[in-house]
Amino acid sequence: VGMVVPFAFCMAALWEGRLDAVWTRWSRPWALAAWGFLTIGIALGSWWAYYELGWGGWWFWDPVENASLLPWLAGLALLHSLAVTEKRGVFKAWTIMLAIFAFALSLLGTFLVRSGVITSVHSFAADPTRGLVILVILGIIVGGGLLMFALRGWRLTIESQYQLISRESFLVINNVIILI
């Protein structure tokens, strides 16, 4: 749940109406640390499954494995967008949405693993009551974040124009490919 800090900076920037480079500058190291630890966790889990357990593969596309991959992909897109938003001042709305969804996907992964909703060799501590509590927390936080974006997002200025063939255009294409 390391994406909580970029999410919190995003919400604070929306609340204050200060959607400048400051919140992205403060968010980027935290997003990088969270994404880095998630990368290490996924790599170590894959190594462990292959060598120690002898499952014969690095990745089995198990629902719980995918629950860790989704915030990793959203975090990767967030890191790229934070850099461009900080340096060029573009993609503010996109970056805010990525911060919300990266955190939401990490909470969704917690819900899937802990609730017993899915059947997996990786799911543990399946407790419907705990799952309901996590789902309510997920709904409040993500719903509140999206509501804040809807109420305060109008403060976003019109982004500067950029060329069709530019770094910004390729970043948008890159982020769309990552998220698909």
Language-model regions: role of each:
Residues 1-180:
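Polytopic transmembrane helical bundles with strong interfacial aromatic enrichment
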